[in-house]
Regions:
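Conserved N-terminal structural module of periplasmic/extracytoplasmic solute-binding proteins
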Residues: 4-7, 17-94
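Extracellular glycan-interacting surfaces
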Residues: 10
Length: 95
């Protein structure tokens, strides 16, 4: 058991050390919410050394943008979205 735990932590360490940046799409595009997300991204970067690019996406455009990005092989690392997208995106292989 101890060997498994050590292996898991070592894997996580080496996986995270190769990440230089994260792309984050958010539908929380209101100025106050964007400012808070930017602050959280800066805090995360200061603690991990991993930069976060916060990209606002209007909720009405999210489905089309995600589908196009998936087709182009250029999805972001993280998408903040509503539950309505979970099943169709899972079926399409986006999630």
């Amino acid at each position: 058991m101890k060997k498994i735990i050590i292996y898991i932590f070592a894997s996580l360490f080496f996986a995270s050390s190769s990440i230089s940046g994260i792309t984050f799409w958010t539908t929380e595009v209101q100025p106050a919410r964007m400012a808070k997300q930017q602050d959280m991204a800066k805090d995360f970067e200061s603690k991990t050394g991993i930069s976060v690019e916060v990209i606002p996406v209007e909720e009405k455009d999210l489905g089309k943008r995600a589908t196009a990005a998936a087709a182009a092989g250029d999805l972001p690392d993280v998408i903040y979205h509503t539950l309505q997208y979970v099943l169709p995106w899972a079926e399409a292989g986006i999630l």
